[in-house]
Design a protein with these regions (language model features):
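N-terminal membrane topogenesis motif
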Residues: 1-28, 81-84, 88, 117, ...
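Membrane-interface junctions at transmembrane-helix termini in multi-pass inner-membrane proteins
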Residues: 12, 69-78, 129-156, 167, ...
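Alpha-helical transmembrane segments and their helix-entry boundary regions
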Residues: 14, 18, 45-46, 69, ...
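Small-residue-rich midsections of specific transmembrane alpha-helices
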Residues: 19-22, 28-32, 46-74, 87-90, ...
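Alpha-helical transmembrane segments of multipass membrane proteins
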Residues: 30-35, 136-140, 162-167
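Helix-loop interface residues and adjacent transmembrane-helix termini in multi-pass membrane transporters
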Residues: 39-42, 111-114, 143-144, 170-172
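Short membrane-interface helical motifs at transmembrane helix boundaries
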Residues: 96-114
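Hydrophobic alpha-helical transmembrane segments
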Residues: 118-125, 151-190
């Protein structure tokens, strides 16, 4: 006798996999936040928040949001071409933003009202590129229905970010928040 299979069982399983991964990835930083608030100053968090905001805004434009289109094509080849396009656009945008930031670094940091961000503005283009690649691969993995891998990537990113935040913070380096964020995302992207 055939076992009754709900048409939603695969969907439910995939959704639960993603929900579990996302939940674990969010629990990790919440769990260590009491420690991190003692290792990093409010000023360190301010510079980090400003850095993340700049990267998020530039990332929204860098790839032209073409990563959203990776899911749409019927043919795998077309989706792969869109994936490649997002990489090229992100690379070109990052190179242009590096030039702009190199020329106007001091002016930008003055407009932002934070002199400490000036040295981190040079890192922004690389972070934008990394963010675009990470998002593009996430959509690609979603298209390939690799939900366990997506969930694992989120947990790995969160875990590596948290552990490097702790390690660098214990060393007394305020820049650890930014570096750890980049480290966690680069590990999850590979």
């Amino acid at each position: 006798m055939k076992k009754f299979q709900s048409p939603f069982s695969e969907f439910t399983s995939n959704a639960l996999t993603l929900i579990t991964g996302t939940t674990l990835a969010q629990v990790i930083p919440v769990a260590i936040s009491p420690i991190l608030t003692r290792l990093y100053s409010p000023e360190d968090y301010g510079v980090f928040a400003l850095f993340v905001s700049i990267v998020a805004i530039l990332s929204a434009f860098a790839s032209g949001k073409y990563e959203l289109a990776i899911m749409l094509p019927r043919r795998e080849r077309d989706a792969a071409n869109i994936l490649g396009l997002t990489f090229v656009l992100a690379m070109v945008s990052s190179a242009i933003s590096l030039g702009v930031l190199a020329i106007f670094n001091e002016s930008i940091s003055q407009v932002l009202g934070n002199e400490k961000i000036a040295k981190w503005l040079y890192v922004v283009p690389g972070a934008v590129f990394l963010n675009c690649v990470f998002l593009s691969f996430s959509y690609w993995e979603n298209r390939q229905k690799r939900y366990k891998r997506l969930a694992l990537n989120r947990v790995v990113q969160s875990g590596f970010t948290a552990s490097s935040n702790l390690g660098i913070g214990l060393g007394g380096y305020g820049w650890g928040l930014i570096l750890s964020s980049l480290f966690g995302q680069s590990v999850a992207t590979t």
